[in-house]
UniProtKB/Swiss-Prot annotation:
It comes from Homo sapiens (Human). It comes from the Eukaryota. This is Putative protein ZNF321.
């Protein structure tokens, strides 16, 4: 790109310089990718914290390889995505969409919460179950059938129920 520069020399005479501005083009875009990943991770963690504060269940993220994948999903979502460097100039990346991994300890916390919730549900189901009792009249004798232990008190018709 050609650009003209003007400067004022001694004696108030204007001198015009013509020069060429060039940007150093590098085919190594790893630095830009890492900067974008760091920004995405920061945004992801901030979003995660906001959702935890609001009491919403944290979303599960899909775990994928960042490089080397050639399945249809990656090809479908790959495209020219502009990435800006620190100087504000942008270029197009032909990299597949970046996926962020959940930190291992956050996945562990989700599993632990699920286990605790499941055990609370099982405990409440156990507490709410009442013993099954059936009263029937077989052959003219009244008898009580229960899932609780029974102790005989003397005759075959007198029984006392003891809770567990």
């Amino acid at each position: 790109m050609m650009k003209e520069f003007s400067s004022t020399a001694q004696g108030n005479t204007e001198v015009i310089h013509t020069g060429t501005l060039q940007r150093h083009e590098s085919h190594h875009i790893r630095d830009f990718c890492f900067q974008e990943i760091e920004k995405d991770i920061h945004n992801f963690e901030f979003q995660w914290q906001e959702e935890e504060r609001n009491g919403h269940e944290a979303p599960m993220t899909e775990i994928k390889e960042l490089t080397g994948s050639t399945d249809r999903h990656d090809q479908r979502h790959a495209g020219n995505k502009p990435i800006k460097d620190q100087l504000g100039s942008s270029f197009h990346s032909h990299l597949p969409e970046l996926h962020i991994f959940q930190p291992e300890w956050k996945i562990g916390n989700q599993v632990e919460k699920s286990i605790i919730n499941a055990s609370l549900i099982l405990t409440s189901q156990r507490i709410s179950c009442s013993p099954k009792t059936r009263i029937s009249n077989n052959y003219g004798n009244n008898s009580l059938h229960s899932s609780l232990p029974i102790q005989k008190l003397g005759s075959t018709h007198e029984r006392k129920i003891f809770p567990m």
